[in-house]
């Protein structure tokens, strides 16, 4: 990758789920779960500190059907719903992003993956280097000389054009 300006795109749902499952039974004084919020903040602060990106955004899914549901009634039909104690933490994760200066991007009718894919390819086409922060291997199809994937799990793994 060159020394071009860099855009970091966070797969918000993926990293929120990761935090939720990595830290169990963490609650606030009111008894409500805070594990996903705490884990997401920790990941985000480390990401900012370690990589000092020039531009950043976090993409999240919105509730409701997407264009894929219109194409296939069975799309994600067997997927379990998001746990209620995680649903209750979504706004806290969004607040953390805003507090740390990370814009949230969403688009009704599209998944966060679609938003990230669009932003990454458009940014790369304008000369920006792009880093997608996710544990989702589906993003490997986007990897090229301008787009890399970073999985922050453990000490972090980089996926570049010569490694996917």
Q: Model-found features: residue ranges?
A:
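Noncatalytic, basic helical substrate-engagement surface that gates or grips nucleic-acid strands
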Residues: 2-133, 137-160
């Amino acid at each position: 990758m060159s020394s071009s300006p860099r855009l970091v795109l966070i797969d918000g749902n993926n990293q929120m789920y990761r935090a939720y499952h990595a830290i169990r039974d963490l609650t606030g004084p009111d008894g409500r779960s805070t594990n996903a919020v705490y884990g997401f903040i920790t990941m985000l602060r480390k990401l900012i500190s370690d990589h000092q990106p020039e531009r950043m955004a976090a993409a999240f899914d919105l509730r409701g059907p997407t264009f894929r549901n219109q194409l296939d009634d069975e799309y994600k039909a067997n997927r379990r719903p998001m746990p209620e104690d995680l649903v209750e933490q979504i706004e806290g994760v969004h607040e953390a992003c805003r507090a740390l200066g990370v814009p949230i991007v969403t688009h009704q009718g599209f998944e966060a993956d679609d938003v990230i894919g669009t932003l990454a390819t458009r940014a790369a086409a304008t000369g920006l280097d792009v880093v997608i922060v996710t544990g989702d291997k589906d993003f490997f199809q986007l990897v090229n000389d301008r787009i890399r994937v970073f999985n922050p799990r453990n000490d972090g793994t980089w996926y570049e054009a010569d490694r996917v």
